[in-house]
Design a protein with these regions (language model features):
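Surface-exposed loop/turn elements that mediate protein-protein interactions on large endomembrane-trafficking
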Residues: 2-16, 45-65, 89-112, 140-165, ...
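Generic structural motif
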Residues: 7, 20-21, 31-40, 47-50, ...
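Repeated scaffold domains used in trafficking and secretory/extracellular systems
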Residues: 15-25, 63-79, 111-122, 159-177
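Short beta-strand elements that form the blades of beta-propeller/WD-repeat-like
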Residues: 28-44, 78-89, 127-134, 177-194
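Extracellular-facing segments of soluble proteins and assemblies that are Gly/Ser/Thr-biased and enriched
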Residues: 82-112, 116-134
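Short aromatic loop motif centered on NTY/YTY
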Residues: 117-119, 128-136, 143, 153-202
Length: 255
């Protein structure tokens, strides 16, 4: 299913293989990403190409060919300059400084068992990025990376005093934000029945049916909360906060 980057470049990116085009605009509105999708061959996934334009000048900043059917990308800011994250392969990363056109890519160093990145957000100054990532076929999780100097790469920041009961899961509903350049808050949220004063997973079948008949009975409520801080080049768990139901879950897991 996977071809080399060189073969991918030479074989598939032809006008007769183009099947769709979609536009995406940067946060500032100054840049436009056009994602083109190309059919490859029977039994294989499609490939994509991202073309990044400066809207004011009309110039093409970069063109990125990707060996996967989804062109994962994110716009973010670093030191007041706008950047684009994408990837030439599904297991590598490519960063483009949209102000200068400079590109940083690790596709030649990455391997198929590397993390696959789906989304990137930066801290306020852009020196730390949080990543929604997974090993191919595995569950998604949040990772943190040092993005101080992309010319020397981006090293993953390990967790300090990791708390397994406060897993940074993105498979369910969650909220996150940077409290400052080094401090990050994550809130795991779950549906909660206001009538029965229970989380949805605790409802009986009868209660589920009754709840579903009540308009807006289910609300999103905190299940647990975590605050992490970058200290000595690691992300340390500083605060953990649980709902009563989560405390019961922890107790049951420890028995």
């Amino acid at each position: 299913m996977i071809d080399s980057i060189n073969q991918m470049t030479n074989d598939y990116y032809k006008s007769e293989n183009l099947i769709s085009t979609k536009e995406h605009f940067s946060t500032s509105g100054k840049y436009k990403l056009i994602v083109e999708t190309y059919i490859t061959k029977p039994g294989c996934w499609n490939y994509t190409k991202g073309i990044i334009h400066n809207i004011e000048t009309g110039s093409v900043i970069q063109e990125i060919k990707r060996n996967y059917c989804v062109f994962h990308h994110s716009f973010f800011f670093k030191n007041n300059q706008e950047w684009l994250f994408c990837g030439k392969t599904y297991y590598s990363q490519c960063f483009i400084n949209l102000e200068t056109g400079e590109i940083f890519d690790n596709s030649t160093e990455s391997k198929p068992d590397s993390f696959c990145w789906a989304n990137v957000k930066s801290n306020p100054n852009g020196n730390i990025i949080i990543v929604e990532q997974c090993i191919w076929g595995g569950p998604y999780e949040i990772g943190f990376y040092d993005f101080t100097d992309p010319s020397i790469g981006w090293t993953e920041l390990e967790f300090d005093n990791y708390q397994e009961n406060y897993y940074l899961n993105i498979e369910w509903n969650y909220e996150s934000k940077w409290l400052d350049n080094d401090t990050f808050e994550y809130i795991q949220k779950e549906d909660y029945s206001t009538k029965f004063q229970k989380f949805y997973d605790e409802l009986t079948v009868e209660e589920e049916l009754e709840s579903s008949a009540i308009e807006n009975d289910l609300v999103s409520r905190m299940y647990y909360r975590v605050v992490l801080k970058k200290i000595d080049n690691k992300m340390r768990f500083m605060v953990t906060e649980s709902s009563p139901q989560h405390l019961i879950e922890i107790q049951n897991n420890n028995e």
